[in-house]
């Protein structure tokens, strides 16, 4: 039987600190459930104890990525928070030019492809959507564009037929011929690579900021401000709390709330 590797309170706090430094994510409130889940994860890391794991985590690049993949895994689906997605497309169409959209984090691609199919339904062709995420496994899934039927439950049958190719194993693969250009990149929003992604008219950052501490939120707002075009908009999730900064002003519109670049 596999020996369980259980972290001490100090070791767990050190792990949470390392993850925060790497990604900005604050796992303090999830300490109890994290301790339980770590046992299973550590079985595949070839470490004798948690202290050895922490030592490797600080220097082993592959282990860093595997650990980030572990702590950021989550479920998502197509057309999530649909009203806001429609508002993004409504604004994009009003610009009457080529529109660049950033989805950060993009998870396994459902948000990016949801925006793309809504754009297609609104006859928007000149649009580029880039999805970035810190989790390597979800980025690979997004690039593949193959999904289980349950993630498409909010789509009509006609939408499924137009935008997906159904396989015999009951998986659905995105029909990219029907969509605007969608790309995906592995990227940490706090690393230098993020600043080189280009300029965007819209950033959709939904259900990520809620996991950041206050300092990381402020840093992220500055980074978002830097890559947005003038009057660019930031859309966040319903649970995301945005600190007041010099970079954005909060706008209340009949179609919902967004943040405009100052």
Curated annotation (Swiss-Prot):
It comes from the Bacteria. GO terms for biological process: chemotaxis; methylation. Pfam families: CheR. The keyword Signal does not apply. It catalyses: L-glutamyl-[protein] + S-adenosyl-L-methionine = [protein]-L-glutamate 5-O-methyl ester + S-adenosyl-L-homocysteine. Residues 1-262 form the CheR-type methyltransferase domain. Keywords: Chemotaxis, Methyltransferase, S-adenosyl-L-methionine, Transferase. InterPro entries: Bact_Chemotaxis_MeTrfase, CheR_C, CheR_MeTrfase, CheR_N_sf, SAM-dependent_MTases_sf. Its EC number is 2.1.1.80. S-adenosyl-L-methionine binds at residues 76, 80, 111, 133, 188-189, 206-207. One of its GO terms (molecular function) is protein-glutamate O-methyltransferase activity. It is an enzyme of class 2 (transferase). The keyword Nucleus does not apply. Methylation of the membrane-bound methyl-accepting chemotaxis proteins (MCP) to form gamma-glutamyl methyl ester residues in MCP. This is Chemotaxis protein methyltransferase. It comes from Campylobacter jejuni subsp. jejuni serotype O:2 (strain ATCC 700819 / NCTC 11168).
């Amino acid at each position: 039987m596999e020996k369980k590797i259980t972290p001490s309170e100090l070791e767990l706090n050190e792990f949470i600190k390392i993850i925060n430094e790497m990604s900005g994510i604050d796992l303090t409130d999830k300490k109890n459930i994290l301790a339980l889940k770590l046992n299973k994860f550590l079985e595949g890391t070839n470490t004798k104890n948690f202290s050895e794991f922490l030592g490797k985590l600080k220097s082993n690049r592959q282990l860093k990525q595997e650990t980030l993949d572990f702590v950021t895994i989550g479920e998502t689906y197509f057309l999530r928070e649909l009203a806001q997605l429609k508002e993004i497309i409504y604004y994009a169409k009003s610009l009457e030019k080529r529109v660049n959209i950033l989805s950060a984090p993009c998870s396994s691609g459902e948000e990016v492809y949801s925006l793309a199919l809504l754009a297609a339904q609104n006859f928007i062709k000149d649009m580029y959507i880039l999805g970035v995420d810190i989790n390597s496994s979800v980025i690979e899934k997004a690039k593949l564009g193959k999904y289980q039927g349950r993630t498409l439950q909010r789509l009509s049958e006609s939408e499924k037929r137009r935008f997906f190719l159904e396989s015999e194993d009951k998986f659905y693969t995105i029909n990219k011929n029907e969509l605007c250009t969608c790309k995906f990149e592995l990227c940490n929003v706090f690393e230098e690579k993020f600043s080189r992604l280009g300029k965007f008219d819209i950033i959709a950052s939904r259900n990520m900021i809620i996991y950041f501490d206050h300092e990381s939120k402020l840093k992220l707002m500055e980074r978002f401000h830097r890559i947005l075009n003038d009057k660019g908009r930031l859309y966040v999730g319903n649970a995301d709390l945005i600190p007041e900064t010099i970079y954005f002003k909060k706008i209340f519109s009949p179609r919902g709330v967004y943040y405009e670049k100052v």
